[in-house]
From Swiss-Prot:
Role, per record: With S4 and S12 plays an important role in translational accuracy.
UniProt family annotation: Belongs to the universal ribosomal protein uS5 family.
Domain notes: The N-terminal domain interacts with the head of the 30S subunit; the C-terminal domain interacts with the body and contacts protein S4. The interaction surface between S4 and S5 is involved in control of translational fidelity.
GO aspect biological process, one term: translation
Organism: Mycoplasma genitalium (strain ATCC 33530 / DSM 19775 / NCTC 10195 / G37) (Mycoplasmoides genitalium)
GO CC terms in record: cytosolic small ribosomal subunit
Record protein name field: Small ribosomal subunit protein uS5
UniProt-listed InterPro entries: Ribosomal_Su5_D2-typ_SF (IPR020568), Ribosomal_uS5 (IPR000851), Ribosomal_uS5_bac-type (IPR005712), Ribosomal_uS5_C (IPR005324), Ribosomal_uS5_N (IPR013810), Ribosomal_uS5_N_CS (IPR018192), Ribsml_uS5_D2-typ_fold_subgr (IPR014721)
Single GO molecular function: structural constituent of ribosome
Cited NCBIfam families: rpsE_bact
Amino acid sequence: MNDQKTTNTGLLTSTLKTKPKHNLKPSSEAIKKAVSKKEGHYKNKRFQKHNFNNKSEFEERIVKLKRISKTTKGGRNMRFSVLVVVGNKKGKVGYGIAKALEVPLAIKKAIKKAHNSIHTVEIHKGSIYHEVIGRKGASKVLLKPAPLGTGIIAGGAIRAIVELAGFSDIYTKNLGRNTPINMIHATMDGILKQLSPKKVALLRNKPISDL
């Protein structure tokens, strides 16, 4: 009996000795390769998602933040509405409005919409080429070129647009309703309606020297 137990113990010991050992802990090189591969994947994913512009160069400004409510059978549903303007002060500007239950989420959504609606505007010596009136609904905004050193003569929502677009000398005046979103629409309408000498030459089918 004792001899049989000794034999079984010997077989078990030999089996354990001959069983291959599996190294469950990965090496440091394998860990580094996996981490670098994962980081590269996320970097490429972010680049593909946001390759329309470089957000780091854009400045963001909140023009209007207000609380809104909707009355239903269950009571009032409170939310926040945010109007944001973004621009790089080099001829690119956009704006967005969004609503959410919390202020940070509303701001984030508005900024995303603003970045998705970027417009490229023409700037002539820090101002615009000629006098123009932009319209949106009952809002009208007058834009006039100003000499060097005048500065930005504007306020509120109009100032946010012209400043972040990159204008340094310009006269503006609100001629209608002062609803922030409509004023921004009207200002953008006026800025985009201006005609440079090159555009006028193309419309008239003449060289710039003949204008």
